[in-house]
A protein has these predicted regions:
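Ferredoxin-type iron-sulfur electron-transfer modules and their immediate structural context
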Residues: 1-51
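Cofactor-cradling patches in redox/metallo enzymes
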Residues: 143-145, 150-243
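Iron-sulfur cluster-binding cysteine motifs and their immediate structural context
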Residues: 36, 45-94
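Short amphipathic C-terminal alpha-helix that caps PH/PH-like domains
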Residues: 242-250
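Fold-independent oxyanion-binding glycine-rich loops
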Residues: 39, 67, 88-90, 104, ...
Length: 258
């Protein structure tokens, strides 16, 4: 036991200071919010739309990109001969309205998630218990949600915890495209959470079905089964993107430090 204590003393404090301090630097391979330069698109070019594996890009009447469907695979960026699509380093992607994830040309920022109303923040602002439902996910989004519980992120310091039963929860955190076999289970889980409650959809699959969209055995995301209060896109979203969304929902972010 003494060796454990000595090792802990030597390691010192490992939890990052964010959001009280600036966020950690994102890795070189990180791909954040895309930026569209529609003016660069030559007439009749469909290179980006044809390259997109999920149909996230539309060109009529102008270039649009649906982040709810986007896998951040950069196939469109690589396919575009005019560099009309580039990925920024902006990790802030969470929104309250699904429609807010549809990017227009030269759109500088998303309409980022607004905080819950005052009554809800009083209930959940310092103690939010979530039941995580993997509705047919591949475990990538689940893994990055799990990362938030490690010592580096320490999700519990914000009063946010994952619980084992929906009856002990304030809401649901849903991953996966919602397979046919999980549709009823998700609905029953939602009904078991006491009101008032919130629902958070994490990852492209939970937002739109992701690469499985329109398959006969999936529901194209959580919103087709239960109402959703927060949408966090990505495949999978970075832990910082997930944390940013949760803190925005609870009104616990100082914008000057993000």
């Amino acid at each position: 036991m003494i060796q454990v204590l000595l090792a802990r003393l030597k390691q010192r404090h490992r939890t990052m200071k964010y959001p009280a301090a600036p966020p950690p630097e994102m890795p070189d391979r990180f791909r954040g919010r895309p930026l569209l330069a529609g003016s660069k698109c030559p007439e009749g070019c469909r290179a980006c739309a044809d390259a997109c594996p999920t149909g996230a890009i539309t060109l009529d009447p102008e270039l649009r990109l649906d982040l709810g469907k986007c896998l951040f695979c950069t196939e469109c960026e690589q396919a575009c001969p005019q560099n009309a699509i580039t990925c920024t380093r902006d990790y802030r992607l969470a929104v309250r309205k699904r429609q807010a994830l549809i990017l227009a040309p030269d759109q500088a920022e998303l309409e980022l998630a607004a905080a819950l109303d005052t009554k809800s923040r009083r209930l959940f602002g310092h103690s939010l218990k979530l039941r995580q439902v993997s509705a047919g996910g591949c475990n990538a989004c689940e893994a990055d949600v799990n990362v938030l519980g490690t010592v580096g992120w320490d999700l519990g310091r914000f009063g946010i915890q994952m619980v084992a039963s929906p009856r002990h929860a304030d809401g649901l955190l849903i991953t996966g495209p919602v397979t046919e076999n999980m549709k009823l289970a998700l609905r029953k889980t939602y009904d078991s959470v006491p009101a008032p409650k919130i629902v958070i959809a994490v990852g492209a699959c939970a937002l739109s079905g992701g690469p499985y969209r329109d398959h006969a055995e999936v529901q194209n995301g959580a919103e087709s089964v239960v109402p959703v209060d927060l949408f966090i896109p990505g495949c999978p979203p970075h832990p910082l993107t997930i944390l940013d969304g949760l803190l925005r929902l609870l009104g616990r972010l100082d914008e000057s430090k993000t």
